[in-house]
Protein backbone atom coordinates (compact mmCIF):
# COMPACT_ATOMS: atom_id res chain seq x y z
CA UNK A 1 0.00 0.00 0.00
CA UNK A 2 2.82 2.46 0.76
CA UNK A 3 4.45 1.87 -2.62
CA UNK A 4 1.08 2.17 -4.32
CA UNK A 5 0.44 5.47 -2.54
CA UNK A 6 3.70 6.92 -3.87
CA UNK A 7 3.06 5.97 -7.48
CA UNK A 8 -0.63 6.82 -7.27
CA UNK A 9 0.42 10.35 -6.29
CA UNK A 10 2.66 10.39 -9.37
CA UNK A 11 -0.21 9.28 -11.61
CA UNK A 12 -2.57 11.88 -10.17
CA UNK A 13 0.05 14.61 -10.60
CA UNK A 14 0.68 13.63 -14.23
CA UNK A 15 -2.85 12.83 -15.40
CA UNK A 16 -5.19 14.52 -12.92
CA UNK A 17 -6.72 11.20 -11.90
CA UNK A 18 -5.81 7.78 -10.58
CA UNK A 19 -7.06 4.22 -10.49
CA UNK A 20 -6.11 0.62 -10.97
CA UNK A 21 -4.48 -1.11 -12.74
CA UNK A 22 -1.73 1.47 -12.31
CA UNK A 23 1.14 1.76 -14.80
CA UNK A 24 4.11 4.05 -14.09
CA UNK A 25 7.17 4.05 -16.37
CA UNK A 26 10.48 4.95 -14.69
CA UNK A 27 13.95 5.95 -15.79
CA UNK A 28 16.78 3.61 -14.70
CA UNK A 29 17.26 5.78 -11.60
CA UNK A 30 13.58 5.24 -10.68
CA UNK A 31 12.27 8.66 -11.70
CA UNK A 32 8.76 8.56 -13.26
CA UNK A 33 8.14 10.03 -16.71
CA UNK A 34 4.86 8.47 -17.87
CA UNK A 35 1.80 7.24 -15.96
CA UNK A 36 -1.58 5.77 -16.85
CA UNK A 37 -4.24 3.53 -15.37
CA UNK A 38 -5.82 0.96 -17.70
CA UNK A 39 -3.92 0.46 -20.97
CA UNK A 40 -5.56 -1.84 -23.55
CA UNK A 41 -3.48 -4.21 -25.64
CA UNK A 42 -4.41 -2.52 -28.93
CA UNK A 43 -4.81 1.20 -29.61
CA UNK A 44 -8.17 2.85 -30.27
CA UNK A 45 -8.98 6.38 -31.49
CA UNK A 46 -9.28 7.53 -27.86
CA UNK A 47 -6.56 5.54 -26.12
CA UNK A 48 -3.06 4.24 -26.97
CA UNK A 49 -2.57 0.50 -26.64
CA UNK A 50 0.35 -1.20 -24.93
CA UNK A 51 1.75 -2.57 -28.20
CA UNK A 52 2.08 0.97 -29.58
CA UNK A 53 2.91 2.70 -26.31
CA UNK A 54 5.97 0.61 -25.39
CA UNK A 55 7.91 1.28 -28.62
CA UNK A 56 6.93 4.95 -28.44
CA UNK A 57 8.23 5.35 -24.88
CA UNK A 58 11.39 3.46 -25.80
CA UNK A 59 11.99 5.85 -28.71
CA UNK A 60 11.35 8.89 -26.50
CA UNK A 61 13.87 7.59 -23.96
CA UNK A 62 16.38 6.92 -26.73
CA UNK A 63 15.93 10.09 -28.79
CA UNK A 64 14.51 12.71 -26.41
CA UNK A 65 16.22 11.97 -23.12
CA UNK A 66 16.43 15.63 -22.14
CA UNK A 67 12.65 15.91 -22.47
CA UNK A 68 12.20 12.79 -20.34
CA UNK A 69 14.53 14.21 -17.68
CA UNK A 70 12.64 17.51 -17.69
CA UNK A 71 9.26 15.79 -17.24
CA UNK A 72 10.52 13.52 -14.48
CA UNK A 73 12.18 16.46 -12.68
CA UNK A 74 8.94 18.45 -12.81
CA UNK A 75 6.94 15.55 -11.41
CA UNK A 76 9.43 14.87 -8.63
CA UNK A 77 9.46 18.56 -7.70
CA UNK A 78 5.65 18.66 -7.56
CA UNK A 79 5.50 15.56 -5.36
CA UNK A 80 8.20 16.91 -3.04
CA UNK A 81 6.44 20.28 -2.79
CA UNK A 82 3.20 18.54 -1.93
CA UNK A 83 4.99 16.59 0.80
CA UNK A 84 6.49 19.78 2.28
CA UNK A 85 3.19 21.63 2.55
CA UNK A 86 1.84 22.20 6.03
CA UNK A 87 -1.15 20.25 7.27
CA UNK A 88 -4.47 21.96 7.91
CA UNK A 89 -5.13 21.68 11.62
CA UNK A 90 -8.68 23.03 11.64
CA UNK A 91 -11.02 20.08 10.91
CA UNK A 92 -13.80 22.36 9.65
CA UNK A 93 -11.47 24.11 7.23
CA UNK A 94 -10.18 20.74 6.04
CA UNK A 95 -13.75 19.62 5.30
CA UNK A 96 -14.59 22.85 3.46
CA UNK A 97 -11.37 22.59 1.45
CA UNK A 98 -12.13 18.99 0.48
CA UNK A 99 -15.64 19.94 -0.65
CA UNK A 100 -14.34 22.87 -2.72
CA UNK A 101 -11.68 20.79 -4.41
CA UNK A 102 -14.04 17.93 -5.18
CA UNK A 103 -16.78 20.14 -6.60
CA UNK A 104 -14.20 21.90 -8.77
CA UNK A 105 -13.71 18.54 -10.53
CA UNK A 106 -17.43 18.11 -11.27
CA UNK A 107 -18.39 17.18 -14.83
CA UNK A 108 -21.26 19.61 -15.53
CA UNK A 109 -22.44 17.74 -18.61
CA UNK A 110 -22.46 14.11 -17.47
CA UNK A 111 -21.98 14.20 -13.71
CA UNK A 112 -19.16 12.55 -11.81
CA UNK A 113 -15.98 13.97 -10.38
CA UNK A 114 -13.30 12.58 -12.70
CA UNK A 115 -12.56 12.15 -16.39
CA UNK A 116 -12.91 8.73 -18.01
CA UNK A 117 -12.68 6.04 -16.84
CA UNK A 118 -15.45 6.95 -14.41
CA UNK A 119 -15.88 4.91 -11.23
CA UNK A 120 -18.87 5.15 -8.88
CA UNK A 121 -16.56 6.74 -6.25
CA UNK A 122 -19.24 6.26 -3.61
CA UNK A 123 -17.11 7.50 -0.66
CA UNK A 124 -16.80 10.86 -2.47
CA UNK A 125 -20.56 10.97 -3.06
CA UNK A 126 -21.31 10.06 0.57
CA UNK A 127 -18.97 12.78 1.84
CA UNK A 128 -20.51 15.40 -0.43
CA UNK A 129 -24.05 14.26 0.43
CA UNK A 130 -23.40 14.70 4.14
CA UNK A 131 -21.75 18.05 3.44
CA UNK A 132 -24.73 19.21 1.34
CA UNK A 133 -27.22 18.18 4.03
CA UNK A 134 -25.30 19.74 6.93
CA UNK A 135 -24.63 23.00 5.10
CA UNK A 136 -27.91 23.01 3.13
CA UNK A 137 -25.99 23.33 -0.11
CA UNK A 138 -28.47 22.76 -2.93
CA UNK A 139 -25.88 23.05 -5.70
CA UNK A 140 -23.81 20.16 -4.31
CA UNK A 141 -26.96 18.09 -3.80
CA UNK A 142 -27.80 18.67 -7.47
CA UNK A 143 -24.31 17.46 -8.45
CA UNK A 144 -24.89 14.26 -6.51
CA UNK A 145 -28.34 13.56 -7.92
CA UNK A 146 -27.16 14.26 -11.48
CA UNK A 147 -24.25 11.86 -11.01
CA UNK A 148 -26.45 9.14 -9.51
CA UNK A 149 -29.04 9.57 -12.26
CA UNK A 150 -26.37 9.25 -14.96
CA UNK A 151 -24.97 6.14 -13.30
CA UNK A 152 -28.41 4.58 -12.93
CA UNK A 153 -29.70 5.31 -16.43
CA UNK A 154 -26.41 4.73 -18.23
CA UNK A 155 -24.79 1.59 -19.53
CA UNK A 156 -22.92 1.12 -16.27
CA UNK A 157 -26.00 -0.36 -14.64
CA UNK A 158 -27.45 -3.73 -15.59
CA UNK A 159 -31.07 -2.70 -16.09
CA UNK A 160 -32.25 -6.31 -15.98
CA UNK A 161 -30.49 -7.73 -12.91
CA UNK A 162 -30.03 -4.43 -11.10
CA UNK A 163 -26.29 -4.63 -10.39
CA UNK A 164 -23.67 -2.02 -11.27
CA UNK A 165 -20.65 -2.74 -13.44
CA UNK A 166 -17.14 -1.82 -12.28
CA UNK A 167 -16.72 1.50 -14.10
CA UNK A 168 -17.58 3.40 -17.28
CA UNK A 169 -14.88 3.64 -19.93
CA UNK A 170 -16.23 6.96 -21.26
CA UNK A 171 -17.34 10.29 -19.81
CA UNK A 172 -21.05 9.71 -20.57
CA UNK A 173 -21.31 6.52 -18.44
CA UNK A 174 -22.21 4.59 -21.59
CA UNK A 175 -19.84 1.66 -22.10
CA UNK A 176 -18.83 -0.14 -18.91
CA UNK A 177 -16.10 -2.53 -17.96
CA UNK A 178 -18.61 -5.32 -17.45
CA UNK A 179 -17.27 -6.92 -14.26
CA UNK A 180 -19.58 -6.66 -11.24
CA UNK A 181 -18.03 -6.61 -7.77
CA UNK A 182 -19.74 -7.16 -4.42
CA UNK A 183 -18.00 -4.16 -2.85
CA UNK A 184 -19.41 -1.84 -5.52
CA UNK A 185 -22.93 -3.23 -5.07
CA UNK A 186 -22.76 -2.68 -1.32
CA UNK A 187 -21.57 0.90 -1.69
CA UNK A 188 -24.12 1.70 -4.41
CA UNK A 189 -26.92 0.31 -2.24
CA UNK A 190 -25.79 2.63 0.55
CA UNK A 191 -25.62 5.82 -1.53
CA UNK A 192 -28.95 5.23 -3.31
CA UNK A 193 -30.62 4.50 0.03
CA UNK A 194 -29.21 7.66 1.57
CA UNK A 195 -30.13 9.89 -1.38
CA UNK A 196 -33.67 8.46 -1.20
CA UNK A 197 -33.81 9.34 2.51
CA UNK A 198 -32.72 12.91 1.72
CA UNK A 199 -34.79 13.60 -1.41
CA UNK A 200 -37.77 11.27 -0.80
CA UNK A 201 -37.76 10.51 -4.55
CA UNK A 202 -39.11 7.00 -5.08
CA UNK A 203 -36.79 6.30 -8.03
CA UNK A 204 -33.87 6.08 -5.61
CA UNK A 205 -35.71 3.63 -3.38
CA UNK A 206 -36.35 1.46 -6.44
CA UNK A 207 -32.70 1.65 -7.48
CA UNK A 208 -31.40 0.76 -4.01
CA UNK A 209 -33.82 -2.16 -3.85
CA UNK A 210 -32.76 -3.45 -7.28
CA UNK A 211 -29.09 -3.50 -6.21
CA UNK A 212 -29.97 -5.42 -3.05
CA UNK A 213 -32.05 -7.88 -5.06
CA UNK A 214 -29.08 -8.51 -7.36
CA UNK A 215 -26.87 -9.17 -4.33
CA UNK A 216 -29.33 -11.55 -2.69
CA UNK A 217 -30.14 -13.50 -5.86
CA UNK A 218 -27.01 -13.62 -8.02
CA UNK A 219 -24.20 -13.06 -5.51
CA UNK A 220 -25.76 -14.81 -2.52
CA UNK A 221 -23.64 -17.77 -1.39
CA UNK A 222 -25.56 -20.88 -0.30
CA UNK A 223 -23.68 -21.51 3.01
CA UNK A 224 -24.10 -17.83 3.92
CA UNK A 225 -22.57 -14.57 2.79
CA UNK A 226 -21.93 -13.28 -0.71
CA UNK A 227 -19.66 -14.24 -3.59
CA UNK A 228 -17.05 -11.72 -4.71
CA UNK A 229 -17.90 -10.88 -8.30
CA UNK A 230 -19.17 -11.75 -11.74
CA UNK A 231 -16.60 -11.75 -14.52
CA UNK A 232 -16.68 -9.29 -17.42
CA UNK A 233 -16.10 -12.06 -19.96
CA UNK A 234 -18.50 -14.69 -21.23
CA UNK A 235 -18.03 -17.19 -24.09
CA UNK A 236 -18.89 -14.55 -26.69
CA UNK A 237 -16.22 -12.14 -25.41
CA UNK A 238 -16.15 -9.26 -22.96
CA UNK A 239 -19.63 -7.93 -22.33
CA UNK A 240 -21.30 -10.30 -24.81
CA UNK A 241 -23.85 -11.37 -22.19
CA UNK A 242 -25.05 -7.77 -21.86
CA UNK A 243 -25.03 -6.62 -25.50
CA UNK A 244 -27.99 -6.45 -27.89
CA UNK A 245 -28.47 -6.00 -31.62
CA UNK A 246 -31.32 -4.14 -33.27
CA UNK A 247 -32.45 -7.35 -34.97
CA UNK A 248 -32.65 -9.17 -31.63
CA UNK A 249 -34.94 -6.49 -30.23
CA UNK A 250 -37.15 -6.66 -33.33
CA UNK A 251 -37.40 -10.44 -32.99
CA UNK A 252 -38.34 -10.25 -29.30
CA UNK A 253 -40.79 -7.33 -29.45
CA UNK A 254 -42.15 -7.19 -32.98
CA UNK A 255 -44.25 -4.04 -33.40
CA UNK A 256 -43.17 -2.78 -29.96
CA UNK A 257 -39.48 -2.87 -30.95
CA UNK A 258 -39.44 0.78 -31.98
CA UNK A 259 -40.57 1.89 -28.52
CA UNK A 260 -37.99 -0.36 -26.81
CA UNK A 261 -35.19 0.85 -29.07
CA UNK A 262 -36.12 4.47 -28.45
CA UNK A 263 -36.21 3.91 -24.70
CA UNK A 264 -32.81 2.19 -24.54
CA UNK A 265 -31.02 4.09 -27.32
CA UNK A 266 -30.62 0.97 -29.49
CA UNK A 267 -29.68 1.49 -33.15
CA UNK A 268 -28.85 -0.71 -36.14
CA UNK A 269 -25.33 0.71 -36.18
CA UNK A 270 -24.86 0.04 -32.47
CA UNK A 271 -24.69 2.63 -29.72
CA UNK A 272 -21.24 1.45 -28.54
CA UNK A 273 -19.76 0.12 -31.79
CA UNK A 274 -16.12 1.08 -32.18
CA UNK A 275 -15.69 1.87 -28.49
CA UNK A 276 -12.94 -0.21 -26.85
CA UNK A 277 -13.23 -3.12 -29.23
CA UNK A 278 -17.02 -3.23 -29.54
CA UNK A 279 -18.25 -4.56 -32.89
CA UNK A 280 -20.60 -2.84 -35.38
CA UNK A 281 -24.19 -3.33 -34.24
CA UNK A 282 -23.33 -3.73 -30.53
CA UNK A 283 -25.72 -1.95 -28.16
CA UNK A 284 -25.93 -1.58 -24.41
CA UNK A 285 -29.19 -0.68 -22.70
CA UNK A 286 -28.74 3.08 -22.36
CA UNK A 287 -31.95 4.98 -21.51
CA UNK A 288 -30.10 8.14 -20.28
CA UNK A 289 -33.06 9.07 -18.06
CA UNK A 290 -35.73 7.28 -16.03
CA UNK A 291 -37.47 4.83 -18.41
CA UNK A 292 -40.78 5.53 -16.69
CA UNK A 293 -40.48 9.17 -17.75
CA UNK A 294 -39.65 8.10 -21.32
CA UNK A 295 -42.72 5.84 -21.46
CA UNK A 296 -44.96 8.55 -19.98
CA UNK A 297 -43.71 11.05 -22.56
CA UNK A 298 -44.48 8.49 -25.29
CA UNK A 299 -48.11 8.37 -24.14
CA UNK A 300 -48.00 4.89 -22.58
CA UNK A 301 -51.00 4.55 -20.25
CA UNK A 302 -49.39 2.38 -17.56
CA UNK A 303 -45.63 3.04 -17.67
CA UNK A 304 -44.76 0.85 -14.67
CA UNK A 305 -46.61 -2.19 -16.01
CA UNK A 306 -45.20 -1.69 -19.52
CA UNK A 307 -41.65 -1.25 -18.24
CA UNK A 308 -41.90 -4.37 -16.08
CA UNK A 309 -43.13 -6.34 -19.09
CA UNK A 310 -40.26 -5.08 -21.27
CA UNK A 311 -37.67 -5.99 -18.64
CA UNK A 312 -39.22 -9.42 -18.16
CA UNK A 313 -39.07 -10.22 -21.89
CA UNK A 314 -35.48 -9.02 -22.16
CA UNK A 315 -34.54 -11.06 -19.09
CA UNK A 316 -36.11 -14.21 -20.52
CA UNK A 317 -34.24 -13.69 -23.79
CA UNK A 318 -30.95 -13.19 -21.97
CA UNK A 319 -31.42 -16.37 -19.97
CA UNK A 320 -30.75 -18.25 -23.21
CA UNK A 321 -27.15 -16.97 -23.11
CA UNK A 322 -24.34 -18.36 -21.00
CA UNK A 323 -23.82 -16.19 -17.95
CA UNK A 324 -20.34 -14.83 -17.08
CA UNK A 325 -18.41 -16.92 -14.53
CA UNK A 326 -19.02 -16.22 -10.84
CA UNK A 327 -16.05 -15.77 -8.52
CA UNK A 328 -17.40 -17.55 -5.45
CA UNK A 329 -14.71 -16.43 -3.00
CA UNK A 330 -16.35 -15.14 0.19
CA UNK A 331 -14.25 -12.18 1.34
CA UNK A 332 -14.69 -11.03 4.92
CA UNK A 333 -14.21 -7.31 4.27
CA UNK A 334 -16.59 -7.13 1.30
CA UNK A 335 -19.19 -9.21 3.13
CA UNK A 336 -18.92 -6.93 6.16
CA UNK A 337 -19.54 -3.96 3.88
CA UNK A 338 -22.51 -5.71 2.26
CA UNK A 339 -24.12 -6.87 5.47
Place the predicted regions along the sequence by residue.
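Replace the tail clause
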Residues: 1-337
Amino acid sequence: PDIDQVYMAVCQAMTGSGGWPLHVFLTPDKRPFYAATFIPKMSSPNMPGMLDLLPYLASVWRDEREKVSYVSDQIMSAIQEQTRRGTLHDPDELIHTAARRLTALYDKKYGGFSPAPKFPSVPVLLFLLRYAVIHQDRSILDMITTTLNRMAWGGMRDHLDGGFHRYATDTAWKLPHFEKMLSDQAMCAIIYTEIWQVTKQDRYRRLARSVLEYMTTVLSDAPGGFSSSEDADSPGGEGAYYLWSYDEIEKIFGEEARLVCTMFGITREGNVSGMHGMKPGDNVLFPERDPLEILSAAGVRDPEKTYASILNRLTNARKERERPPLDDKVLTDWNALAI
